[in-house]
Amino acid sequence: MKKTGYFLLAVIVIVAATGVGYWKFSGNPDALREIVLEQCLPDQLQHQNPAPCAEVKPRAGYVVFKDRHGPLQYLLMPTYRINGTESPLLLEPATPNFFWLAWQARGYMSKKYGHDIPDSAVSLAINSRLGRSQDHLHIHISCIRPDVREQLDNDLTRISTRWLPLPGGLMGHEYLARRVTESELAQRSPFMMLAEEVPEARDHMGRYALAVVRQSDDSFVLLATERNLLTLNRASAEEIQDHSCAILSSR
């Protein structure tokens, strides 16, 4: 009976998880890809106009796009087909360091806001295969939740340069945390750090979500959470973000 109960619970969780989507593009999981490949990229190449994207960099291989959810949220996406965290392309040395590029694009938030936004209020996040509803790699550039910001501030000295469990997790889910310098982040992709340093991660990258947050000592914290349906964790690192940017009103 116990085994049957666990099985039914797992089925319910899977159905619920796959039925929840963040994007509402008429159920089209390729909506973002179509925007990038059929609108932004052609407009830039043919007319030197990135619209509807905010920026298109064909040679560097990425675009920046204003997300319609939240006043300041942007997305960084590749100009070619990469589905998400499960893609082996992310572990190729020639692939752009998309997280570093996303961090460089944070200035779009300040420009939209009309004032400088402190780095401590910004976060980057990418969801797992099950934690997303769009099948084109996209890194969310948005505000961090105030409570997550406070927790990471309190854990500043306890976060190691190795991947270790974050005490207490975040948002009720288990997270691994790793501290890196700005130079490390610029030179090495967080996807590669996760795949090469966390046992068995390389073979199951699609199960993971990743986030990047700046700390008060100018280091960065990499955060990773792995899908676990029995604990209702779809591995959506976007959960540490607040697209309403309440953290800005408290400063």
UniProtKB/Swiss-Prot annotation:
Q: What InterPro entries does the entry give?
A: CDP-diacylglyc_Pase, CDP-diacylglyc_Pase_proteobac, HIT-like_sf
In the UniProt record, the signal sequence range is none
Gene3D superfamilies recorded? HIT family - CDH-like
> Hey, which pathway is this one from?
Phospholipid metabolism; CDP-diacylglycerol degradation; phosphatidate from CDP-diacylglycerol: step 1/1
Q: Which residues cross the membrane?
A: 5-25
EC number(s) in its UniProt entry?
A: 3.6.1.26
Q: Which GO terms describe its cellular component?
A: plasma membrane
**Record GO terms (molecular function):** CDP-diacylglycerol diphosphatase activity
UniProt keyword list? Cell inner membrane, Cell membrane, Hydrolase, Lipid biosynthesis, Lipid metabolism, Membrane, Phospholipid biosynthesis, Phospholipid metabolism, Transmembrane, Transmembrane helix
Q: List the SUPFAM superfamilies hit by this protein, alphabetically.
A: HIT-like
The protein's topology relative to the membrane is: Single-pass membrane protein
Entry's localization field: Cell inner membrane
- Give the principal location in a single coarse category: membrane
Q: Name one GO biological process term.
A: phospholipid biosynthetic process
Q: Which reaction does it catalyse?
A: a CDP-1,2-diacyl-sn-glycerol + H2O = a 1,2-diacyl-sn-glycero-3-phosphate + CMP + 2 H(+)
Return the broad EC class. Answer: hydrolase
Specify the domain of life of the species encoding this protein: Bacteria
Tell me if Methyltransferase is a UniProt keyword of this record: no
NCBIfam families membership:
cdh (TIGR00672), PRK05471.1-5 (NF003986), PRK05471.1-6 (NF003987)
What is the similarity comment for this entry?
Belongs to the Cdh family.
The name under which this protein is listed is CDP-diacylglycerol pyrophosphatase
Source organism (scientific name): Salmonella paratyphi B (strain ATCC BAA-1250 / SPB7)
- Write the lineage as a comma-separated list: Bacteria, Pseudomonadati, Pseudomonadota, Gammaproteobacteria, Enterobacterales
